[in-house]
Structure formats: C-alpha cells, structure tokens
C-alpha cells in the first residue's frame, strides 16, 4: 500500500502536502480502501475557513458516509471540483487526481502534530 514519504498524515487518514504556506489535503490509499467504491464527495467552498479537527466535507461510498477532518486550520484556496463529477478518482488516484482542497495555513505549528509516512505506516499496520 502506498504511503508517500514526502507527505504528512493525520490519525483520521488525511494526507497533507506542504508547499510553503499552502497545503494540499486528501485521503490516504488506506482510507479509500476501507471505504470501498466512492460515489459522492462533498467539499467546502473557496474562501471557507476550516479549523483543525473540525469536519470540512464528506465522502460517500457504497458502504458508508465518512466525514473529512481538517488536519490543519486555514482558508480554502481551491476545492477539487473534478471530484463532483468523478468521485471514483478517490479510489483510482488518492494521492494525485483526488486531492480534496488546497488551504492557506493559518498556523504552521499544526504541521508538527502530523505523522511522518513511517509513523502512519506503523499506525495502519503496514
């Protein structure tokens, strides 16, 4: 199972790609595998504020609906609108095509609370 080393991870199975003061957030390959076939994705609007630990959207699979939890706080710069028409990208390409949101960080220290790829791999038993 892929756990890219350049990303950071949350206990709720979100990944975070850091690029300066902007982060890209998505869900991990492990999470999409647990959910099964994704049929719907709900994401926040551009300029919405998200807060660490709060829900910022949801993914619906044939099995269940799962909330998305913000691993960091900040302002949404971009939402991946392609996922509205192609939610299957979450299953097919969780780290590339299926990024969820791009966020301007409001508190960079929150990144220190996220896990490394090695720590995340241990958590999921890989």
Swiss-Prot record:
It comes from the Bacteria. Residues 22-104 form the Lipoyl-binding domain. GO terms for biological process: glycine decarboxylation via glycine cleavage system. Its cofactor is (R)-lipoate. GO terms for cellular component: cytosol; glycine cleavage complex. Pfam families: GCV_H (PF01597). Keywords: Lipoyl. The modification N6-lipoyllysine is found at residue 63. Binds 1 lipoyl cofactor covalently. The keyword Cytoplasm does not apply. The glycine cleavage system catalyzes the degradation of glycine. The H protein shuttles the methylamine group of glycine from the P protein to the T protein. Is also involved in protein lipoylation via its role as an octanoyl/lipoyl carrier protein intermediate. The glycine cleavage system is composed of four proteins: P, T, L and H. Belongs to the GcvH family. HAMAP family: GcvH. This is Glycine cleavage system H protein.
